[in-house]
């Protein structure tokens, strides 16, 4: 990392990959958010959403949001990925989305995020059209999106600073969230000084600190080893418990989809194949439960047809 004092600007929306120009611009020299990006997350999207929210305490409940697609065709004009999608995600649900590579999982997520407009049909949040990114829909991708020159604490503070949360308040909120994800002792570390799993924990804390009503996650644990991945799954369930946030979680791993989801959406052959309820309880020991085994078999069969 260069130590030059020249101003460098990186477009960064909390929880998005660093190459997505949908959020406010931050200056490495001043470390302050500016208003230069046309897609400022605090003002994008439809009216009535929490563009000026001031964050929330770790674990404090928020009101979830309803995400809806009706007769929606998704993708690029020259290459539609999904056709005639009807899907309703009620407030507070964890919907996992599973399917083979190239089936449109990420396209669906980016459409719900407001990064990619639908080609036809309706895409709505609480009955209003999604027309762009919004501060109350947080994004977490597999790629490391932490700003490398900011400590973990400062990274978690970033969306709160963008929202205008006073410095002392956002410092406390960020510290509380890092403690919640088990990183209190790493708060002053730079991202390159911690492991991949710890960076993903910090990204999760950053996504949730600002109190989003929806969290959209695109294979966030895909690059982690099996043991770290299982730990992150357990942590996600624990952190989300009682928050009220609506979650759409994309994965290619059927077992991950069944462990995390209240329902699982199956994509394949350019369409939404099915949406199935996942039996509970959500426990590792339930992996061999007959109902879970039957659902796993049905999901794999659907994906292979």
Predicted stretch roles:
Residues 40-52, 171, 192, 252, ...:
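Histidine (H) residue identity feature
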Residues 270-297:
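Conserved beta-strand-loop-alpha-helix hinge in the C-terminal portion
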Residues 59-244, 248-255, 260, 266:
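ABC family nucleotide-binding domain
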Residues 1-73, 305:
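ABC-family P-loop ATPase nucleotide-binding domain
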């Amino acid at each position: 990392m260069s130590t030059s004092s020249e101003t460098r600007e990186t477009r960064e929306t909390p929880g998005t990959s660093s190459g997505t120009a949908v959020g406010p611009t931050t200056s490495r020299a001043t470390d302050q958010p500016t208003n230069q990006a046309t897609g400022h997350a605090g003002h994008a999207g439809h009216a009535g959403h929490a563009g000026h929210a001031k964050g929330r305490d770790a674990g404090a409940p928020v009101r979830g949001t309803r995400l809806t697609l009706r007769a929606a065709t998704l993708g690029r004009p020259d290459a539609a990925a999904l056709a005639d999608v009807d899907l309703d995600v009620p407030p507070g649900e964890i919907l996992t989305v599973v399917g083979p590579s190239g089936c449109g999982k990420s396209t669906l997520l980016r459409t719900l995020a407001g990064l990619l407009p639908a080609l036809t049909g309706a895409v709505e949040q609480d009955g209003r059209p999604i027309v762009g990114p919004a501060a109350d829909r947080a994004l977490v991708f597999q790629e490391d999106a932490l700003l490398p020159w900011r400590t973990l604490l400062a990274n978690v503070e970033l969306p709160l600073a963008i929202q205008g949360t006073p410095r002392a308040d956002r410092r406390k909120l960020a510290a509380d969230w890092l403690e919640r994800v088990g990183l209190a002792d790493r708060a002053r570390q730079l991202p390159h000084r911690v492991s991949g799993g710890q960076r993903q924990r910090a990204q999760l804390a950053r996504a949730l600190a600002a109190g989003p009503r929806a969290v959209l996650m695109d294979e966030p644990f895909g690059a982690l080893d099996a043991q770290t991945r299982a730990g992150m799954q357990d942590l996600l369930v624990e952190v989300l418990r009682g928050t009220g946030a609506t979650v759409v979680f994309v994965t290619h791993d059927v077992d991950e989809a069944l462990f995390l989801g209240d329902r699982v959406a199956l994509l394949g052959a350019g369409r939404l194949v099915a949406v199935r309820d996942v039996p509970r309880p959500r426990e590792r020991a339930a992996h061999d439960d007959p109902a879970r085994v039957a659902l796993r078999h049905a999901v794999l069969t659907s994906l292979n047809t």
